[in-house]
Every structure is written in structure tokens, then in C-alpha cells.
Amino acid sequence: MLKTALVVSLKAVSKIVLICAGGAYLEKSGVLHKEMRKGVSEAFVKLLLPCLLFTRILPTMSVETLPKLAWLAMANLLYVSLGLLIGYLSTLLTKPPRGLRRVLMATPAIGHANSIPFMLVSLIIAEDPAFNPDDTNTAQGYVGLYLVMHSITLWGVGMNVIKKEKEDEPPLAETTETQTPQTLGRPASISAPSQSTGGLNMSEAREDRWSHSISGLELGSPVTNGGPNTKNQRFSCDPRPLQRFVPKWVNRPMATAVLTALVGLIPGLEELLVPASAPLNFLFGAMSTLGSAGPAVSLLAVGANFVADGFPRPSVIGYAPMFALIVGRLLILPGCCISLWVALRHYAPFFPSDPLLMLVMCIECCTPTAYNLVTVCILNGVGARELTAGLFYQNIVAIFALTAWTTVIVSFVI
């Protein structure tokens, strides 16, 4: 059983890595250049992901699904709360500068919740003989429902936790313009090797470009006057005249998930769209085809962005904080949360017995930190370069951590 689970996990994670490697190859070949990567990311957020959410949530949604939606929301709140606690303890141990403490505190709390879980659950179900092929749509529907609460906590908790640091001291982006970049926990005078100012500026500019590239890989960021990529936008999910009335966590994928969940409760509507003989099945089929391509397209952009501007320097964030960022999100949080779900399943009679729900809830706590936390840092002017460097190395370790946790989940949990 363990050997079978390991094979299933290796195949699933390896496919994700190979898709990302394909994106890296296309970038080095000049195909996925900067503008193309931006277009691919926007296509995923504005069209492919909404189509995926609509076509996966609608068949899954029913009155019987509402308790499972509540469990998914509770799971997200648990991951955020426990992640903040882990992040807080890690800052006490590593003692980063005050300007980065809340950034590092948020990194274990907010995980990547769309392209990796969408792709991973479908690959696990396809490889594991214990599941049926039709289970893929149901599991991806659960991932889509999880995104509802994830979007709220990403922008609500993320923006507030990281933004509070601006009250303590000026943003790091302002201080690094006039002094040598500082390694966490070390004075600026010894934080970097002696080199010319021009060399440092080139390195900082490359890492800043890397931060902006990574920040656009996930859910759409809230529209602000100072936010990235808003100057040339003509259309947006958050129209500027109504911006003050729209919460920051409202974006197109989140709105699609909520509206689809509500529409899915309307009796008889599913019969008009989903069955092969339904009169509007051609519309549903086209959206399903577009949505199915979304995770792979998004992962191509991830791979391309990770190699576009070279490797970030580990000294940008510091080795101790980077180690805490990796261990907290990829080892401690999954270990605590998966153990809790297993205990509840054994001792709480009200816990759902759905193995697909358990699979999604466990996978969501094992993913690396959400790329959109970089967007939050950019919007608040603090810690974007440092967080980006940490996420680069965290994602490398996540290849092995995801394989290990997926093996545990398939073998012992579901």
C-alpha cells in the first residue's frame, strides 16, 4: 500500500514539475517572454479559472454540499490561524528586522490554493485505482469552493497583517534606495560582499522584476491606484468609481465561485447545462474545455517566471528566516492539520466521511505559500524582494515535501 501510494505521489508531483519545466523551456526559447507571460497569467485569472470554477462547482453544488462547504471554510480559517501562530513563533526564533516580521509571520498562513491543488487532486485521482474517473470533477469542485474563503483570508488577513508593519517604520523599499541591502539579522555594512553600486542596482532591479512577475501568477489583485499593472487597464473586476464600496478580497475568480455556488442551488438549472442531452450543454462543454486547460497554462507561466530573471540571492531574506519559512509552511502546518483531521474522523461522528473532501482539505494545507502574498507586499511597499527570494527556495523544497505528504495522505489518510 505504501509503495503504491509513493508511486501515485511521485507521478502526480512529477507531472506538475514537468509542466513547470516546459514553461521554463519556453521562456528560455523566447516564446514565453515578459509580455507573453503577463498575457498568459491574465488569461488564466480572467477567463480560464472562472470557467474552471463554474464547470466544477455547478455539478457539485447542492443543499447536501453546504455542510462540506462549511468544513472547507473552517479548514481555511484553521490553516490561517495556525499558520499565523507558527509564523509568529518563527519570528521570535529567527529575529528578523522589524520591517519584515509581519511579512514572515503571514507566509505559513496563506497557501497556494488554485493551480497546484486543481492539478494535483486530478492527477492523484487519475493514478489511484481507489477513485473513479468521475471523482475528478467533484474534487476540483471542492477546490473551487475552498477558494471562496481563501480569497477572503488572502486579502483580508494578508493585507491587514502585513500593512500594520508600515505603522512601525518606513517601507523597506524606501530604505534600500539609499543604503546597501541588508541581510536579515546583520548590519548593512557586512550584509553583502564588496561590489560596485551599479552591480547592486542591477541585482536589486532583477529581483524587483522577479517580484512583480511572481505576484501576477495567482488570483487577481485588488485594484488600487498604486498597485501593479493598473495604469493601462480599461476594464477591471473592481470598477474604479465603485472601488471604495468593494472589499479588497472581491475578484473575478472569487465572485465566480460565490455566484456559481448560489446558482447551483436553483432547482432544475443543472439539468439545462450539465447533461449531454441538455439544451445548453454546448455552452457548458466549451467552458469546461477552457477551464480544463487552466491549471496547465498557469503552471507554464509559473515555470517561465521562475527562470526569467535568474535565481534570487538567499542572502536577500537571510538563511534562518528562509529555513523557518520553509519548515513552517511545508512541514509543521501540514503535520498538525492532517493529524487533526484524522483525529476528528475517528472520534467525531459529525465529521464528513467523504474521501474526496478529506483529500482536498489535506492537499490545501501542504501547498507552498501563495504567490499573491508578494502582491500584498508590493501594494503595501514592504518586503516584496525578501519574500520573493524565500518563495523561490520554498517552492524547490515543496517538490519533495508535496511528494512526501501526498504519499502519507494517499496511504494512511484517505
Q: Which residues make up each language-model segment?
A:
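Alpha-helical transmembrane segments of multi-pass small-molecule/ion transporters
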Residues: 1-414
